[in-house]
Design a protein with these regions (language model features):
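N-terminal "first-domain core" detector
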Residues: 1-44
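Low-complexity, intrinsically disordered regions in eukaryotic regulatory proteins
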Residues: 66-72, 96-100, 104-105
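Compact, glycine/acidic-enriched structural inserts
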Residues: 80-102
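Alpha-helix boundary/N-cap detector
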Residues: 5-12, 16, 81, 85, ...
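Acidic, proline/glycine-rich low-complexity IDRs
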Residues: 2, 99, 103-151
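Short aromatic-glycine-(Arg/Gly/Cys) micro-motifs in beta-strand/loop hairpins
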Residues: 40-75
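Hydrophobic, Leu/Ile/Phe/Ala-enriched alpha-helical segments that form helix-helix packing faces
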Residues: 17-29, 90, 94, 135, ...
Length: 151
């Protein structure tokens, strides 16, 4: 992990996360052929970047986007009033998705998988649940919401 006081290294890391966010939104056609505007709202240095994003031509459609040591993901901005609420929303969503993925793994037999690639969905579900617990703990800890942690 880089030095938390190295502003240049942090800017480079944050820029990389914002590029991943823009790619995520464009790949899902949420922002179509439009310049993506991304503004960081909160970070846990070198681990989590939470931002609001929108298209320059479609500023009325905003999204909360998360990236870093977690899956790049988004929610509509109306689902959370602030960064802390957005982080909690992602945590709940990932908990539910993790449980759903794990339960689906029990229902899939090897003969049902047409690909030679075998995915351990139980492990995927566990990983998603771990990420959810991590970000919920960050959202729940008052120390993470002091002004020194905001961008």
């Amino acid at each position: 992990m880089s030095n938390p006081n190295d502003k240049e290294a942090f800017r480079a890391w944050a820029h990389e996360q914002m590029q991943a966010m823009a790619k995520h939104l464009k790949s899902r056609s949420l922002i179509d052929k439009d310049e993506v505007k991304i503004e960081a709202r909160w970070n846990y240095p070198y681990r989590i970047l939470l931002a609001e994003a929108w298209g320059v031509k479609s500023a009325h459609e905003k999204f909360w986007v998360i990236a870093g040591d977690v899956p790049v993901d988004h929610i509509e901005s109306g689902l959370a009033l602030d960064a802390r609420a957005a982080l909690k929303h992602f945590a709940l969503r990932w908990q539910m998705q993790g449980a759903r993925v794990k339960s689906a793994d029990r229902d899939v037999t090897p003969d049902m998988q047409h690909s030679k690639l075998r995915v351990n969905w139980s492990e995927v579900g566990d990983t998603l649940a771990e990420k959810a617990e991590f970000i919920y703990a960050l959202a729940d800890d008052e120390r993470n919401w002091e002004s020194t942690m905001r961008m």
